[in-house]
Regions:
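Intrinsic, low-complexity polybasic segments
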Residues: 30-40
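N-terminal polybasic/positive-inside topogenic patches
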Residues: 38-40, 45-49
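A short linear-motif detector with a strong N-terminal bias
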Residues: 1-4, 49, 71-73
Length: 328
């Protein structure tokens, strides 16, 4: 089934439901581009045309194909039935601030018939198990960072050796040690650091990570787990701790897209082209472990593997190894 990320940022729009379709009525000038960029749907359709002759353009998308609806334009009107049916279809709803950065997310509540059973197992998971799982996650993240540095910079700058020193719960904070080596080398800038509000490539990283978080949150709910109950992240004001845990090894996919975007001379503005680059990375198909799969499928496999760990069917989380460049 086609997975679509619909980014409503370019023009005002009114949303409604008709015959299990999400209907988008855009209000735009004749020379404005469509609100749902071509990058948001890798199977172009009339709703993705680069220009519209009418001031009002109505398009529709099957609800079952909407993986996430991202709303950034201040004049997008969305009714309760739209949100309810989007949740019932398993989609995510993301709202952005005036800088087009995601600030809120809504996920389906009842996405799995075994939810009560699995939530009980999740809530009662012992601390030693959580620490062991966090060790696996940190190792996979650092290894993915090492692979990206090797591909782009010709060497991993010691990250592969660092993987072997990660202990249960990462008490030595090897994740942070790796980050201090990783970011300056990745962006070829000794002064580059991850900062949420920095007016540089961090803006693109923040947007890409937020969309990735929504994809993982959707997978978590689909597996019958709750995104709030994390393995390592536990801030009381964070409703998506588990999503933040599980996306860690997938972050380098976003990093790679941002580095390529900046290296191509497209700048660091979070504009339409920047978003298109990031949405393409999320919607791409990746080659891993001898198979070609979407990021949605990979995240779903990771979430389901956590269920199997909690139910004592295995002791390993599933993450893809050696992810290759996206395939069209």
């Amino acid at each position: 089934m086609t997975e679509r990320l619909i980014d409503l940022a370019e023009s005002a729009a009114y949303l409604r439901i008709r015959n299990r379709q999400l209907v988008i009525e855009r209000h735009q000038s004749r020379d404005r581009e469509g609100a749902s960029s071509p990058a948001a749907d890798r199977h172009p359709s009339p709703d993705d045309s680069d220009s519209q002759e009418d001031a009002r353009a109505e398009t529709s998308v099957p609800l079952a194909e909407v993986a996430a609806l991202i709303v950034a334009h201040p004049q997008v009107n969305c009714s309760q039935p739209v949100l309810a049916e989007l949740m019932q279809s398993g989609g995510a709803f993301i709202v952005c601030d005036s800088r087009s950065l995601p600030v809120g997310m809504m996920l389906p509540l009842n996405a799995n018939v075994l939810q009560s059973q699995r939530l009980a197992a999740q809530a009662s998971a012992p601390l030693p198990l959580k620490k062991q799982l966090w060790k696996q996650i940190v190792r996979r993240k650092i290894l993915a960072q090492a692979e990206l540095l090797t591909e782009l910079r010709g060497g991993d700058h010691g990250l592969s050796d660092l993987v072997r020193t990660v202990r249960s719960g990462d008490p030595d904070n090897r994740e942070a040690v790796a980050a201090r080596r990783y970011w300056p080398v990745l962006f070829d800038d000794p002064n580059f650091h991850r900062r949420f509000d920095a007016p540089d490539a961090n803006r693109l990283l923040n947007y890409g990570y937020a969309v990735l978080r929504a994809v993982m949150g959707r997978a978590i709910c689909g597996a019958g787990l709750h995104p709030t109950l994390g393995l390592h992240h536990h801030h009381r004001e964070n409703p998506f701790c588990l999503a933040d845990d599980l996306i860690e090894p997938y972050r380098p996919l976003i990093d790679a897209a941002v580095v390529e975007h900046v290296a191509a001379g497209r700048g660091t503005e979070l504009d339409r082209i920047g978003k298109q680059t990031l949405l393409e990375a999320v919607l791409a198909r990746y080659s891993a472990d001898g198979e070609v799969r979407t990021l949605f499928d990979l995240c779903a496999r990771t979430a389901v593997s956590l269920v199997k760990v909690l139910e004592k069917q295995t002791d390993r989380l599933v993450y893809p190894k050696n992810l290759s460049e996206p395939r069209p």
